[in-house]
Amino acid sequence: FSVRRSSRMELRSTTTAKTAKPVPLGPDSLTWKYFGDLRTGMLGVWIGSLQNMYPQLGAGVEDHSILLREPLQRVARSVYPIMGVVYDGDRARQTGEQIKGFHASIKGVDAAGRRYHALDPETFYWAHATFFMLILKVAEYFCGGLTEDEKRQLFDEHVQWYRMYGMSMRPVPETWEEFCQYWDRVCRDELEINRATLEIFAIKIPKPKFVLMPTPIWDQLFKPMVAGQRWIAAGLFDPAVRERAGMRWTPGDEVLLRLFGKAVEAAFWAVPDEIRLHPRALSAYRRAQGR
């Protein structure tokens, strides 16, 4: 009886999250706690490649994005407004609608003759799902882990967050369990290695013009960072994605990644919020505290 009652309560909670009037996330949410954390940056290759592996998203990047030519500028331009959908409080829905507007003209036909549009509900939701999973992966590996209840809370919050975009809620799974099935299915059956994905794996960070350093030295400095991100991505990919990408991962690699994650977690205990948090997240916390 108690199990059935718990299931009914969970279903009501999730259904309410999907049908209720959009309410922005606040400072007590786990999404606020993790999404603006600097450690999410370590998963740049992971999230960028997973998004680009989705055929419609990859085609849009190949045809319309400057990501591959100017990665730093493109990431900065994208991350700042997306942070706002989480941290802007009463303006979060307006920020979400603005982001939706940015994508209205991204459409076309890919090399295989398939039509794509950035505002296709399935495509738009997949991008959002990768941000949700980014939070879970960062928290699990680099911030001390999550309980099952916290994962379910983050699932409900990701639904609440998604409502800020004013998109169709049709693709959004009803429960945490259904989301896990959705994620497994897309990773197993729908993702593909395309040009946009390969270029993320081989991405280089162009030297800014104001940096007074020879380009070859700059490139050598960034090589270990990009290689490290590829290694982290390999470890956090689902096995089906890792296999499709031709990446190798051993039990020893997993042990090393877990130890590295513990070291990162320990190091960040001494990092002040002014460094640890994205500026939009820091401003939101200060605003919530009346500062």
Residue ranges: model-predicted function:
Residues 3-291:
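Mature, function-bearing regions of proteins
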